[in-house]
């Protein structure tokens, strides 16, 4: 039975040694053996794919992310995001952009974590305007829900994007300023 603890240990060892290929190979083999009761096979393939990306082997990563999608089991993150990252790394820009469109059309703009991941991916690709749209959608999704940790990340990302785009401060940027003030003076903002 696969466990997240086992995969965590493999990831920590890979980070310590820098040998992500070894971790990716091991995780890929373990993912095939996944059974009921532990980590989902889809999540195992996702984590293996992430290690393949860290090992600079996006082709193997694509295979693992596609297996995660085909398995359709539960995953911590949407496998289409890292699959798009691997596609970009392979120069398959049209395929990667199609995945981002698919995410948008499937309602991912209501999921703060996915918005954060897509915004980061698009920032890496230099598409700051679209990244800003995703970050803004993520902030709005957080404000409708309870995800305050993701809200902080999205507000910071959104602020950096707006600065890079030369845009003036807006109400969401001011929320970030209020959070800074509250950390400096807990009585502020009450």
Identify the residue ranges that each predicted region occupies.
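Tetratricopeptide repeat
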Residues: 24-25, 62, 69, 97, ...
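N-terminal alpha-helical interaction modules that lie
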Residues: 1-56, 174-190
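Alpha-helical adaptor scaffolds
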Residues: 41-117
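TPR/TPR-like (Sel1-like) alpha-helical repeat modules
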Residues: 105-108, 124-146, 159, 174-180
């Amino acid at each position: 039975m696969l466990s997240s603890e086992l995969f965590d240990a493999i990831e920590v060892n890979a980070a310590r040694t820098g040998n992500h290929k070894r971790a990716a190979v091991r995780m890929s083999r373990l993912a095939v053996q996944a059974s009921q009761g532990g980590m989902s096979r889809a999540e195992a393939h996702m984590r293996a794919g992430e290690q393949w990306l860290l090992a600079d082997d996006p082709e193997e990563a694509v295979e693992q992310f596609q297996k995660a999608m085909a398995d359709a089991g539960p995953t911590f993150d949407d496998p289409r995001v890292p699959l798009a990252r691997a596609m970009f790394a392979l120069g398959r820009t049209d395929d990667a952009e199609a995945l981002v469109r698919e995410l948008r059309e499937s309602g991912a703009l209501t999921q703060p974590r996915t918005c954060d991941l897509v915004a980061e991916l698009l920032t890496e690709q230099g598409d700051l305007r679209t990244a800003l749209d995703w970050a803004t959608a993520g902030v709005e999704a957080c404000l409708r829900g309870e995800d305050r940790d993701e809200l902080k990340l999205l507000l910071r990302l959104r602020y950096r994007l707006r600065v890079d785009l030369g845009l003036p401060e807006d109400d969401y940027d001011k929320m970030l300023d209020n959070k800074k003030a509250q950390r400096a003076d807990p009585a502020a903002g009450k």
